Structures are given as C-alpha cells and as structure tokens.
Amino acid sequence: MLRTRFINSVNSARAMSRNINTLSQFPYPTLQQEESFFKSQVEDIEKWWASPRYEGIKRPYTAEKVAIHRGTLPQTYASSVQAEKLFNIFTERGKQGLPVHTTGSVDPVQMTQSAPHQEVVYISGWACSSLLTTTNEVSPDFGDYPYDTVPNQVDRIFRAQGLHDKKAWHEWMSLSHEERVKRDQEGKGRIDYLRPIIADADTGHGGLSAVMKLAKLFAERGAAAIHLEDQLHGGKKCGHLAGKVIVPTGSHISRLNATRMQWDIMGCSNLVIARTDSESAKLLSSAADPSDHEYILGVVKPIKPLAEVLLTAEANGATADMVNKLELEWTKEAEMMTYDEAVQRALTEAGKSDKIEEYLTKAKGKSNFEARQIADELAGKHIFFDWDAPKTREGHYHVQCGIEPAIKRALAFAPYADLIWLETKTPDLAQAQAFAKRIREKFPGKWLVYNLSPSFNWSAHGYSDEQLKSFVWDLAKSGFVMQLISLAGLHSNAVATHELSTRFKTEGMKAYVDLVQRKEKELGCDVLTHQKWSGANYLDSIISTVQSGSSGTSSTGGDSTENQF
C-alpha cells in the first residue's frame, strides 16, 4: 500500500513538471505526462524555429507535425553542434564580405593539412565515386554509386577529426599556462581540427523517403551541411558534363523540405544547400510544374515525334551510330523554340507585332495552358506549338538553359534552403555577380555557393595572375560566402604522386628526400613525424595512465626511428 502511494506520488510530481525530456522511463509515464511532454516538444520546436538560425526559412508543415513524428527518446547529434558552428562562421564572414573557401579533402591527411588554413571541410561525390565507394567499384560521377558512399566518407573524415582534436588538445593542455599564452600571442595556438563538414548529397538518391534516409545518415555520420542538386536521380551527371536532366522546380523543393523535415525530427540544426544545374542542363524530366513552362522547347509545325522516328529506325535495322545521327538531324531541322518565342513569331507574321508586349505582360508567370489562351485571343487564331514531339526516347523535354532559368529556380529554392549554389559551365565573375544581385534583391543577405571547379581551364579564360588571386574575394563581396575547389584534393594528390613517381624511377631516394622530407621540414608539415601525427604519443599517454611500468613497451620510446628527426 505504501509502495503504491509512493509511486503515485512520484508520478503526480512528474506530471506537474514541464521539464520532461523523455518518456522512456520507469515508473511508466502517465497520460498527463505524455500530454505535457508533447506540448513542451511543440513549444521547444516553435521557439527553435523562431531563433535567428532559421530567419527567412519556410516550412510547409507545423511544429506539431514534427513533434508527433519524433518519438519519446530524443537524441543529440555531434553534427548539429558542428552545424551551429558553421552557421556562426557563415554569419560572421557574410557580415565581413569575406569568403569561407576550402579545398575538397579525400582522406584524413588532407583534412589535417587543411585544418590550420581552411574553416570548413568539403567532401565531393565526384571524388568518392572515382576513389572510394562502399562497393569499391569506382566510376565517373553519374550518381550511381551506393547511396551510403559519401556518408561513409564523411564518417571516415569525422572520426579522423575526432582523433586529431583529442591529440591536439592533449598536446596543448600538457603545456604550461605560460607556454600556451606565449604560443597564442605568437599565432601558434591550438589547431582546430573540428572544421564543419559540407558534403555532396547529389540528387538525394531516390524518392522523398530515400532523401530523408540519406539526410539522416549524413547527420548521424557528422556532416554539418549537405547540398542537393536539381538533377534527375537516374539521369544525374557531373555538373560539368553534357546530357544533364533536371527535375521540375517543385520536385526539388520537395527534396529540400524532406531534408529539413528529417533534421527537424532529429532536432538537428544542419544546413541545407540547394544547387541548380539549370544554367547548362538542356533536358527536363517532366512538364508538371507550371513554373518551368516558359523554358520548355517545342516545334511550331506538325512533325513526327522524335522518339517515334528513332524507334522506327531501330526497328528497320539502323545501327546505334545511324540512330544518333538521325537524332541530331531531327533536332537541327525541327527548329525548337519556347512558347513565348513561338507566339512572338506568329504575331509578327500576322502583322500584329504591336501585340507582343501585351502578350508578354499578360503571360508572365502563367502556365502554358493560360498562356495559350492569352496568345490565341490576341492572335485571333490558334497558334500551333508542340513540346511533346521533341521529347527524348526517355520521355524528357528539351529546355532552354542559361542564367535566367537558373535565377528563376534559385529564387524558388531560396525560402527553403540556407544557401543557394549556382553551378556554372565557366568561371564567369560578371555572370556570378549579376546572379548574386538578382537573388539578393529579393532575398537580402542570402548566402551563395560557388564551385571553383578544376573542370574549368582557368588559364584559358583571360584572367591575369592578380585577377586569379582576387577572384575568390571579389566573389565574396557579392555574397558568395561559400566557395570550394571541389576536387583540389584529388588533383593535388595526382600531381604530387606523378612528380615523385617520375623522379623516383631514376633518382631513387634523392627524389624522395628532395620532394617529400625536405619539403615537410621547410613547410613545417607535421606528417614528417608520421607516428606522432597518427596519434602514437596520444595513445601512449592513455596506456601509461591506466598501466604503470609500461615505458618499455611505449611506441614512442628511445628505439623509435622517429627520434631521428
């Protein structure tokens, strides 16, 4: 009887508390506690969303919808801590008009060497696809590697960051206070290895449930931010390859919302980056979204559909080369154009060019169905236009690419993303600055991302050495707070290995000493003493702490060859 009263008393007291952070407890929670827990969760989420972290961010769902999907055992994630750090970095650098610029790291060595100089780490999907997938099958960046490939690389780098952070902290705190002050004043303070990781999520690797699972995996593995591009899953290509297919604008917004929803459920502050490839993509997977209609290409005269022409040719025994040639000929002869261009031509031919401005004004922002009604009324007749005839064999629509479609998409993505990434085919500073101006006119202060891609032949674009040197900072002034050389790690790895291998063939150890050891000493590269770099001293310290008399088995004892340095 006393025990029952005690339990009831405990439950009653807990039910009155609003500080319950989990219902996974014993004694088991009451209905009143469950109601209190849910209500507090909703209030916490709403307060979280109202913070400066989410200023200007739009969600198509309520805090109740998030809380009801969270379960009763909330967890915390290290990636969310890193995300808050990343948000603060972007906030400060954005105010200063300075860049957060980084090089893509492909392994722990590159991560540690960039940590003293770059504020973030970037993990490229291209690099993962070509260097290390979870099946060990390497290939071009077609987005067809297992979806856990990049998260696994993030996990690898994040774990390495953890080790080197512990190692650096151990070394730093082993110094006297006076020595730490002295080094700090000399600019030789503790290295921060916990640089926030930004990772490549490609297209999200599937439908919305796949996108959510991928977002969850990234958060669990340590990524502070991910970027999602508006290409079609299954048709994805590297942003600097031809043949890219983009999805409807609304479909990509759904991916962004799915990612945000997943992280809201997890209670993570991770950042969502929306990338558009529409500046160079020439195909669209569906015409379902009216906002894409003005850029879809069609024909203005009845013609046998392209897909039908190709299938007929194949059925008649045409070779692959013959079919490809036939496709090029059809596309060239069809004279494709947008509906607006078709209307302008029709009005001009009908002697009604004075109606063009009226049409463009009335049709602006309208669906193709509505635009057709406006055009037919002004023309006094039906204007023929067929955007289905040019569809590819896969059913994709041809679209007009360029900076205008990219701006329109970026503006549509902006309310749902923390940063906007414009993928371009050339390193055009003026184009990027114009893009930034258009975006920031509607979304003041919006952070932008630029890929300083190695796919560009930088020396062939007319930049002087001084212009190349200032390019990153010039971009930053326009709002491109995040800039990255996505494959710098891959290329620097290749160059260093190529030079060493070439010279080692004929010069033997002289090549190694000249190109590696002497350079490591000159530059102060800590991998010179690779045992210490890998954490041998740190681990010895732990072992000697738990086991006395272990100096004879210490890995860094007098017999270690590293004492030669």
UniProtKB/Swiss-Prot annotation:
Keyword Mitochondrion included in the entry's annotation: yes
EC number, UniProt record: 4.1.3.30
Active site, per annotation: 238
pH dependence per the UniProt record: Optimum pH is 7.3-7.8.
CC cofactor: Mg(2+)
The keyword Membrane belongs to this UniProt entry's keyword annotation: no
GO cellular component: mitochondrial matrix
Cellular compartment(s): Mitochondrion matrix
EC top class, as a word: lyase
Temperature dependence: Optimum temperature is 40 degrees Celsius.
Stored CDD domains: ICL_PEPM
One example GO MF annotation: methylisocitrate lyase activity
Signal peptide positions on this chain: none
InterPro entries: ICL/PEPM, Isocitrate_lyase, Isocitrate_lyase_ph_CS, Pyrv/PenolPyrv_kinase-like_dom, Pyrv_kinase-like_dom_sf
The protein's name: 2-methylisocitrate lyase, mitochondrial
